[in-house]
């Protein structure tokens, strides 16, 4: 058996095409496009690529990203908080995202909590996370929302199924577990202290892997016919010195066991950016229409 490939890049392209039409219609109706401000502090090279992709994708669908800013690493926490306050008050800015990680002298928790919940398009403000816990509408974390959209578009049944999540971060593991619960899955969350991980993953009808460890999950850990969602993205170097991107799943072996699997790249990553754009449009509509 060879798994069906869940192509997140193709799905993201389709959703972004739909967003482009929606943004054009909204701009004609309200006289301005949705506005997104991505704040990047410092010179982390990985962050540079992520920020560039977010701004480029935003522009492509018609979102105004002119108020995105690259800030010096020496910027103080007080200065960053003051900037967020100004963006919170700016009626042309519908979404604010602070690119992580931040320099060590800045408390990321205080910074993320300063963003107005209605402009928190990364879905990390306590208010939005609380709404998720309560099952209420709100801006959802981008990567978990992307995972759920992939599962939905693929027609993967969740009600009554066993879903195992590897990882418990506030960025992915915890919110995706809550979203799976919302769809009536029986959810098991595992992490670095979990005993006999393989015994648990072999129970999964749906396995979501967000461990941050290259190729952690092998074919022996996967139940035949399971759906595997690989959230990880890691750059590794082989014995010849060649660099390549891999996920947290050993794709080549697991694809022979699973019913469906997301690749790395072209899997969850493109959907994360797309959900950011969708959240920005959602915030815009909530503020101007509702």
UniProtKB/Swiss-Prot annotation:
One Pfam family linked to the record: THF_DHG_CYH
Gene3D superfamilies: Leucine Dehydrogenase, chain A, domain 1 (3.40.50.10860), NAD(P)-binding Rossmann-like Domain (3.40.50.720)
Signal sequence interval, chain numbering: none
The EC number(s) this enzyme carries: 1.5.1.5, 3.5.4.9
Positions that bind NADP(+): 167-169, 192, 233
Gene Ontology CC entries for this record: cytosol
UniProt xrefs under PROSITE patterns: THF_DHG_CYH_1 (PS00766)
Pathway: One-carbon metabolism; tetrahydrofolate interconversion
BP terms from Gene Ontology: L-histidine biosynthetic process; methionine biosynthetic process; purine nucleotide biosynthetic process; tetrahydrofolate interconversion
Function summary: Catalyzes the oxidation of 5,10-methylenetetrahydrofolate to 5,10-methenyltetrahydrofolate and then the hydrolysis of 5,10-methenyltetrahydrofolate to 10-formyltetrahydrofolate.
Protein name: Bifunctional protein FolD
Organism taxonomic ancestry: Bacteria, Bacillati, Cyanobacteriota, Cyanophyceae, Gloeobacterales
Gene name per UniProt: folD
């Amino acid at each position: 058996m060879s798994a069906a490939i869940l192509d997140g890049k193709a799905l993201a392209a389709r959703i972004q095409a739909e967003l482009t039409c929606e943004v054009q219609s909204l701009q004609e109706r309200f006289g301005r496009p949705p506005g997104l401000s991505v704040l990047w502090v410092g010179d982390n090279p990985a962050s540079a690529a992520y920020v560039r992709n977010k701004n480029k994708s935003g522009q492509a669908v018609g979102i105004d990203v002119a108020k995105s800013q690259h800030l010096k690493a020496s910027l103080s926490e007080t200065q960053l908080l003051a900037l967020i306050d100004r963006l919170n008050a700016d009626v042309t800015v519908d979404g604010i995202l602070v690119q992580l990680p931040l320099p060590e002298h800045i408390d990321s928790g205080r910074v993320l909590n300063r963003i107005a919940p209605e402009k928190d398009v990364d879905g990390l403000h306590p208010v939005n996370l609380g709404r998720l816990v309560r099952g209420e509408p709100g801006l959802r974390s981008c990567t978990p929302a992307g995972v759920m959209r992939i599962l939905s578009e693929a027609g993967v049944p969740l009600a009554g199924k066993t879903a195992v999540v590897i990882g418990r971060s506030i960025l992915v593991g915890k919110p995706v577990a809550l979203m799976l619960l919302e769809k009536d899955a029986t959810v098991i969350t595992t992490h670095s202290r979990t005993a006999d991980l393989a015994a648990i993953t072999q129970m999964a009808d749906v396995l979501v892997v967000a461990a941050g460890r290259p190729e952690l999950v092998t074919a022996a850990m996967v139940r035949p016919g399971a759906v595997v969602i690989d959230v990880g993205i890691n750059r590794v170097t082989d014995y010849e010195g060649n660099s390549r991107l891999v996920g947290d799943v050993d794709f080549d072996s697991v694809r022979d066991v699973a019913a469906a699997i997301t690749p790395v790249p072209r899997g969850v990553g493109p959907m994360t950016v797309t959900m950011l754009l969708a959240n920005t449009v959602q915030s815009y509509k909530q503020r101007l229409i509702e």
